[in-house]
Amino acid sequence: MKSRVLLDSSVWIEWLTKGKRLSACQKYMDKSLIIGVPSIVVFEVCRKVQMKVSEDEALRVAAWLRTFGVLTFNDELALYAVDLSINFKLGMADSIVLAHAYREDAQLVTLENDFSSLKNVAVIRS
């Protein structure tokens, strides 16, 4: 059985921009495996799209991301993210994304090396 995954904003951006690591990302883009998109990932991806392309395109991307289900952020998850941030020396957004993945028992998939030493994380390098 394939494992459930949570994609970091870096993977969504790589997918949308058809970046050089797109082929390595594709195996994780199976909608049946993706547990949802954290609301902070929607923010990060749409901010990038709006800055680089347009607000209209960012709204289209947000609508598409919603089809995967948006994972909301609450106080319980915030406190869990605080612990992860302190223990692993992660920034706010990274610790929130990791908290979502860990809470849902999903593998975090990312392009960011900051996560490389953490359990249940796949860092796409090529």
Q: Residue ranges of each PLM-predicted region?
A:
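Acidic, PIN/NYN-like endoribonuclease modules and their adjacent C-terminal/linker elements
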Residues: 2, 98-126
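A general structural signal for well-ordered alpha-helical segments in protein cores
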Residues: 22, 42, 58-61, 74, ...
